[in-house]
């Protein structure tokens, strides 16, 4: 009797380009794809949408959220026009500039990232337009509603099970990345697992 081949795991990953913790987790999931047979799908969420009805935000963070609309609007416009396959290279280009290179001039980041991803320059106009906001909200809620109201990003759906995290301060590489994925799949497969957490003691490191 032939044994059935193991079913490929699917990781649906919701990102906002501005979040440094999400950036690290996204680089981890791409490392996992090198050592495990998984399908990775990127989707757009929005920190600005997540926080738009909160009155307790510090003024500096509130200003940051006002700027956060631009990159996600461009990302969702690119997806709408060219398909979900463009999100990985576009996010990678944005994240490298924002986090690895420390470039926070978002207009410049958007323009250069579109070029890197081979996408039309005119998509940059979406950054200051609300034309794609309904699509952005739909994508955001598809990822975030399933995981709950009191979390942000990184949010991953592992084989359809949604959770916040893992939150990592460094990018696991090779088999180390694979082992962390194996543990994540194990947690996700148990329907009564909800949370495992400790206080962060170091900043994100992008190398």
From Swiss-Prot:
Keyword Ubl conjugation: no
Record flagged with keyword Transferase: no
CC annotations in GO: cytoplasm; peptidoglycan-based cell wall
Family matches, as InterPro entries: Rv2466c-like (IPR053977), Thioredoxin-like_sf (IPR036249)
Name of a matching Pfam family: Rv2466c-like
Keyword terms: Cytoplasm, Oxidoreductase
Subcellular location: Cytoplasm
UniProt main location, coarse: cytoplasm
Example GO molecular function: oxidoreductase activity
Subunit structure: Homodimer.
Function: In vitro, the reduced form of Rv2466c catalyzes the reduction and activation of TP053, which is a thienopyrimidine derivative drug that can kill both replicating and non-replicating M.tuberculosis.
Name recorded for this polypeptide: Thioredoxin-like reductase Rv2466c
Species per Swiss-Prot/TrEMBL record: Mycobacterium tuberculosis (strain ATCC 25618 / H37Rv)
């Amino acid at each position: 009797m032939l044994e059935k081949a193991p079913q490929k795991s699917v990781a649906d990953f919701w990102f906002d380009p501005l979040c440094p913790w999400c950036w690290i987790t996204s680089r981890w999931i791409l490392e996992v794809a090198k050592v495990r047979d998984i399908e990775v799908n990127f989707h757009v969420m929005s920190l600005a949408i997540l926080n738009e009805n909160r009155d307790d935000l510090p003024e500096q963070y509130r200003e940051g959220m006002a700027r956060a609309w631009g990159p996600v609007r461009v990302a969702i416009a690119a997806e709408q026009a060219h398909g979900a396959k463009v999100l990985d290279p576009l996010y990678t280009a944005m994240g490298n500039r924002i986090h690895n290179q420390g470039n926070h001039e978002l207009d410049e980041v958007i323009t250069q990232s579109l070029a890197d991803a081979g996408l039309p320059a005119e998509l940059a106009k979406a950054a200051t337009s609300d034309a794609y906001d309904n699509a952005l909200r739909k994508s955001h809620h598809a990822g975030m509603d399933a995981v709950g109201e009191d979390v942000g990003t990184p949010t991953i759906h592992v084989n359809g099970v949604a959770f916040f995290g893992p939150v990592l301060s460094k990018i696991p590489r090779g088999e180390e990345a694979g082992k962390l994925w194996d543990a994540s799949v194990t947690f996700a497969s148990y329907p009564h697992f909800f949370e495992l957490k400790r206080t962060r003691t170091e900043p994100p490191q992008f190398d």
